[in-house]
């Protein structure tokens, strides 16, 4: 497998372009539980250009009804990215606020039910990151440049994207916009 560096600029540019709109290449899951992780996955794909088409446990989108749980589900997105096994697709580590960069992801528990419910992408951060100067873009409560401090969360976790693995013989089509 080949390592693919994460193109943070491409991920953030995609986030800015589609924060208040919907890319017609992807279904809008807003009325089916929310579109935040679908949007986060689109941003991540814009920055890596690779998917993992393993049924059930991969990370991919083909159509509205042919996608992995990790493409649209908050906990499955986390599980896929932080899995320690080396496999095709992007990977990340859970980190703290001081380690995040634009293009990384945040997961928030908003409902107080002990489950993470929301996945924004970080688009900007201050020199010393804080809840006031880490700014995010998201769907399901569409936002761009929204400070983390403005969310009424009960728990938060950060996902620092390290890159992706891709098979050298299978370059995938890359269409960030």
Regions of interest found by a model, annotated:
Residues 1-72:
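N-terminal capping segments
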Residues 20, 44-45, 111, 125, ...:
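Residue-level marker of positions within ordered structural domains that often coincide
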Residues 121-177:
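Glycine-rich, aromatic-bearing surface loops/beta-hairpins
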């Amino acid at each position: 497998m080949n390592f693919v560096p994460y193109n943070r600029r491409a991920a953030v540019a995609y986030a800015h372009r589609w924060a208040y709109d919907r890319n017609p290449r992807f279904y809008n899951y807003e009325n089916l539980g929310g579109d935040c992780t679908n949007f986060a996955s689109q941003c991540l794909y814009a920055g890596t250009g690779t998917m993992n088409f393993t049924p059930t446990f991969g990370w991919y989108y083909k159509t509205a009804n042919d996608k992995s749980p990790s493409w649209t589900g908050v906990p499955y997105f986390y599980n896929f990215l932080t899995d320690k096994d080396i496999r095709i697709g992007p990977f990340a580590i859970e980190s703290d606020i001081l380690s995040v960069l634009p293009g990384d992801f945040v997961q928030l528990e908003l409902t107080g039910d002990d489950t993470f419910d929301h996945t924004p992408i970080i688009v900007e951060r201050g020199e010393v990151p804080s809840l006031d100067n880490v700014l995010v873009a998201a769907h399901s409560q569409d936002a761009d440049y929204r400070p983390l401090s403005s969310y009424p969360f009960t728990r938060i976790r950060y996902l620092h994207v390290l890159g992706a693995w891709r098979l050298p013989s299978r370059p995938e089509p890359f269409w960030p916009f």
